[in-house]
């Protein structure tokens, strides 16, 4: 039994657009992560990712330019870009780099909530404040992005009617741990790059 290899026209028409599509998914996903690393001051990782992003982009665009008569390479290039943005955001959500500040405002007594947050290892600042309807408790806690669901679970369990906002934190003082848990590789790299 012999297999016939596809001719150049078949390769150019079908296989090349597929390769361009996947190359764009990879380079745009890398670009999304690179931008996030730049925002988080992870300069070394941003540089390495930038190198591979541009290398893959040059390879993809050169194939499009060499095959200007194949409209499928244009479509693959654009679809790869769109898909790469989506995949890049999914990857970023999965690795969840960085810290967040959760601001909780509640009219209900927040003693139980703050105690559970402290027991879970989160630093908590609890202030008396005054809102439109009277006295409120204002609670601040800084957590890693991957731990925000845990914090919100506690808020909903102990103060289900509390109002909360979540914001990105660019920098957390090194000697104050966000959560005293085992650090992953990205956390260790971020701490090393700040020094």
Curated annotation (Swiss-Prot):
Q: How does it sit in the membrane?
A: Multi-pass membrane protein
Q: Name one GO cellular component term.
A: plasma membrane
Q: What is this protein called?
A: UPF0316 protein Pcar_2434
* Residues that span the membrane, as ranges: 13-33, 45-65, 71-91
What's in the keyword line of the UniProt record?
Cell membrane, Membrane, Transmembrane, Transmembrane helix
Entry annotated with the keyword Membrane: yes
The record's subcellular locations are: Cell membrane
Upper classification of the organism: Bacteria, Pseudomonadati, Thermodesulfobacteriota, Desulfuromonadia, Desulfuromonadales
Please verify whether the record's keywords include Calcium. no
Q: Which family does it belong to?
A: Belongs to the UPF0316 family.
Q: Which Gene3D superfamilies match?
A: 3.30.70.120
Q: Which Pfam families match?
A: DUF2179, DUF5698
Q: Which InterPro entries match?
A: DUF2179, DUF5698, N-reg_PII/ATP_PRibTrfase_C, UPF0316
């Amino acid at each position: 039994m012999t297999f016939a290899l596809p001719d150049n026209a078949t390769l150019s028409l079908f296989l090349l657009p597929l390769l361009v599509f996947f190359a764009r998914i990879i380079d745009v996903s890398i670009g999304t992560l690179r931008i996030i690393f730049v925002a988080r001051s992870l300069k070394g990782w941003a540089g390495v990712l930038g190198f591979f992003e541009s290398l893959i982009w040059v390879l993809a665009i050169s194939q499009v330019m060499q095959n200007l008569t194949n409209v499928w390479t244009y479509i693959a290039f654009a679809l790869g870009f769109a898909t790469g943005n989506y995949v890049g955001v999914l990857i970023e959500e999965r690795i969840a780099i960085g810290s967040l500040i959760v601001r909780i405002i509640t009219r209900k007594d927040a003693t139980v909530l703050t105690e559970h947050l402290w027991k879970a290892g989160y630093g908590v600042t609890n202030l008396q404040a005054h809102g439109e309807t009277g006295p409120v408790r204002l609670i601040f806690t800084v957590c890693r992005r991957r731990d925000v669901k845990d914090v919100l679970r506690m808020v909903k369990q102990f103060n289900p009617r509390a109002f909360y906002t979540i914001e990105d934190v660019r920098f957390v003082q090194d000697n104050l741990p966000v959560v005293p848990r085992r650090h992953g590789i990205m956390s260790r790299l971020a701490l090393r790059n700040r020094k």
